[in-house]
Structure formats: C-alpha cells, structure tokens
Amino acid sequence: LFKDVFDAKFYSQLCSDFPDDMKFERHDYDKENNLKQKKFILNENNIFFKEIINKKESLKKIYNFLCDQKFKEDIFDLLEKNSIRLQKHNTQGVLRKILNKIKNIKNFGFEFSMISTDGGFIRPHTDGSNKLISFVIPIVENKSIENVPNSGTNILKSTEDRYKYNFLNSTVPFESTEIVRKIPFNGNQIFFFIKTHNSLHSVGPMKNLDGETFMRKSINFFIYK
C-alpha cells in the first residue's frame, strides 16, 4: 500500500476526468451464485475506451505510464529487493510480439470500475490465473465514500480446506473466509497484490450511509503473464 502517490493537482484532475456512468457496461451478475454484485466496468473491450483515454490528458498520462514496459520492470525490481522473484516474461523478440498481437495476448490490462454502495460487493476470489499482479487506484471525489462500511478491500484467508488452494480463481462464500487485513478505500493511494493460489480478497457487501448511494470508483491495472 502506497499513500500520497500522485501530485494533489493531478489526482484531483484524475478524479474529475473519470468517465461518466453512461459509458460503463454492467458486469454485476455472478452466474455461479445467482447474485447481483452491482458492479460496472469500462475496459479495452469497450468501443469507446481508446477515445475516452485520449480525450482526457490525465487519463492518457496514467494509462501510458502504467502500460509502459519500464513500469513493469520497476515493479519487478521493487519486488526482487524484497525477496519476491517473479518470472518477468519481458524478453520478447519481434516474432513473439507479432504472435501475441495475432492471438490478442495482452501484457497489461486497464479498467475503470464502479460498484454501488447500495449493497454492492465483489465475492472472495484470488484473481484469474493469467494475472501476475493487480493494482487498485481509488478514485475518491466525495470523502463520504471513505466512511461507507466495507468500502475497502479485505485480504482474506479461507476457513475451509477445500478453498485453501484456489489458483483457478473459484469464488468463495464470504462465510468461508476470515479477514486478515483491511485496506481502506482512501484517496491518492495505490495498492497491489500478487496473484497466488491463496491471494484471496473481496469488497463489501457495502451499505449506504444515511440512505445516500455512492459509486465506489477505481482504476484497476493488471500485469499479465
């Protein structure tokens, strides 16, 4: 968890430039468990994505910075200094790059996310097996969101043996988990975690304050294998 990451003026602009609700696609149905998560996303699969990124200078800057190979190398160097060594997959020749392009294999993922505070949640999961590292940048325009119960990210451990090795990212019932650490949803911070068989985490379920509904907005970024 890193605090006060951005220049205050840039972070304020980043919050202002966050895409409007109409551009988002509903991604709120958990088919496996027949539950509505009240989640909305906007990512590279949206036909408006590139246009949205390029129209706003702050979004363009953060996108280009995160998706640059140097950022990936810096993160790997930081992890290595802390005795965490991951396979870098960064020595790609021209042929490999062409094949990846043809197969639509991506090195990075970038998305805008919104979750309603009116009961919204993300069930406990470990992230897809194609991911190496996930980053979350909270977008906090209204400080009230920081006081919404369960608006942060909970780092969990499974209380049942059948969920303890979960590399393939099966969702886990909330009642089969125990909170190890709570990461608050505060402005101008970034936190990241490494995908493992037990990198279990969740959001919510959230509850409105004084009957007022907010959207928990974030920029999520992924480094893929």
Q: Over which residues does each language-model region extend?
A:
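Non-heme Fe(II)/2-oxoglutarate
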Residues: 1-84
